[in-house]
Amino acid sequence: MAADFTSYFPQLVRGLVLVAPGGLIRRSHTTWKSRLLYSTSGLMPESWIESLVAKRLYTGPEVARSIEPEPDTVENAEIKTANRGDAVYASSHYALLPGNPYSTVGAVVDWQIKHHKGFVPAFISSIRYAPVHSEHARWRILGQNIANITKGSGKLKRVYIVLGETDPIIVKDEIIEDARECLGSGNVEFEVVIGAGHEVAIERADDIVRVLGTALHMW
């Protein structure tokens, strides 16, 4: 969202730090099941889709599943199965509030599924319409905005991207390759947090703050 906003309104943004960003996720990773489940074709009643998505999101007391659309296969030490739809993440049991064992990512998602009727439809909508996949064209506009600074048409000088080393959703090597191609190698800087997965922003807040501090100093 931040990258898309900046591509449309470059004059309003001086600096941009993206943490495990969507946008450049390659469509080739999405299985036919997710394509069908999140499609707007009308082949499945919306009530069925909501029920199926809720079951996929619900973790229960012992297991924690990824809440992202899954790719065909992933080979990553953080997960226990080859299909991301069945991937089990230990980090989903990470407490959001220190000292509160009931504030884990999985527990919060479960609570919303049970008590917030708008949560699942909102999640489905975000997957369908948010700029998650194949937004390379808009990212190239970001790169052009940076190149146009000398012409007075933008303020953004550099993009900082923070990635989890073992993130099976925002695949480090792919994002680095595609972001450099879209933005220009000299316009983007990467920080790979060693040992972190997709929940890097939750588990490694100190590393995120350090990158923000560096970026603010540069701006």
Predicted regions and their residues:
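Conserved hydrolase catalytic core segment
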Residues: 1-32
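Short aromatic-enriched loop/helix-cap "lid" or pocket-rim segments at secondary-structure transitions
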Residues: 13, 27-33, 37, 166, ...
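Post-His helix in hydrolase/transferase enzymes
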Residues: 174-177, 201-218
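Acidic, Ser/Thr-rich intrinsically disordered and amphipathic helical segments
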Residues: 1-4, 108, 118, 122, ...
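Conserved loop-alpha-helix segment in the C-terminal half of the alpha/beta-hydrolase fold
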Residues: 140-196
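Helix-rich cap/lid subdomain of alpha/beta-hydrolase
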Residues: 25-130, 134
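Short, solvent-exposed loop/turn segments at secondary-structure junctions
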Residues: 22-24, 165-168, 197-199, 215
